[in-house]
Amino acid sequence: MNPDIDDTTAALRALRSQSRLDKATAGAWKRGLDWLLSMQNDDGGWPAFEKNTDSPLISSLPIEGADTVSTDPSSADLTGRTLEFLGRYAGYKENDAPVQKAVRWLLARQEIDGSWYGRWGIAYLYGTWAALTGLMAVGVSPAHPAVQKAVDWLTRQQNADGGWGESCHSDEQKMYAPLGASTPSQTAWALDALIAVHPRPTPAIERGIDYLSRQSQAADWTTAYPTGGGRPGGTYFAYHSYRWIWPLLALSHYQSKYASAS
C-alpha cells in the first residue's frame, strides 16, 4: 500500500513555508509534490492510497464489503482536497493539465441536487466542501453553474440554529440524510465551502459563524457524533480533534478573507 494522499497534502501544507527557506526541506517538498501528481488516476481524480484500482472484478469478489474496501477509486473528497492543495500551495491553476483532468472529473460526478458524495467523511456535506474549496483554489469561477448549484444545495441544508448536520445513514443509502441536529465539524465544512465561494459574508455564513461561536464549549452528543467515514454501513470514526480543528480552520478563513474586505 502506498502512503496516504490526504496525509501527504497535509504534510506538504505544513512544510511549504520552510521549503522556501532551506534546500533540504525544498527537496522533500518537491519529492512529495511529484509523488502526489504521479498518483492521479487515469480518470482524472485522486484515490486515497492506490492508483487505478477500480476494477469491477475486484469489487465483485465474494467478500463482505468488497465493493468498498477492496478498491480505491477516485473520490470527490480526495480530488477536491488535492486540488485545494495544488491551487493554494503549489501554484497550480485551471489551465494546468492535471487540474484540467481533475476539474472535469469532479464536474462530471456532481449529484443532480448539486452536492458531491464524500468517501472518507460524512458524507455529502464533506464531499461538497472538498469539491467547492478545491474548485475555488484552482480558479474556477464562483459563477460557474456547478458551483452555484452546490452553494444552493448547501444553503438549503442549513439548520435553524445556523449549523449543519448529516447522518451516517447518508453514507449507507447514498442519499443525503439530515441528522436532525448540527455538529461542529460538519458546520465547519459547509461554512468553509461558502466562505471559499462568496467574496463577502452572506446571512448563511454569519449564522454559521454564530453557531460555531456559541458551540465552542459544548459537550453534548453532537460534538462526539462520528463524521469520519470508514466502511459504509459498518464502520465510522469519531475523531476527537474534529470538533476543534475544522471550526478553527473555518473561522480563520472567515477572518483572513473578510477582515480586509470590511
Question: At which residue positions do the language-model features occur?
Answer:
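Preference for long, amphipathic alpha-helical scaffolds in soluble/luminal domains
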Residues: 1-262
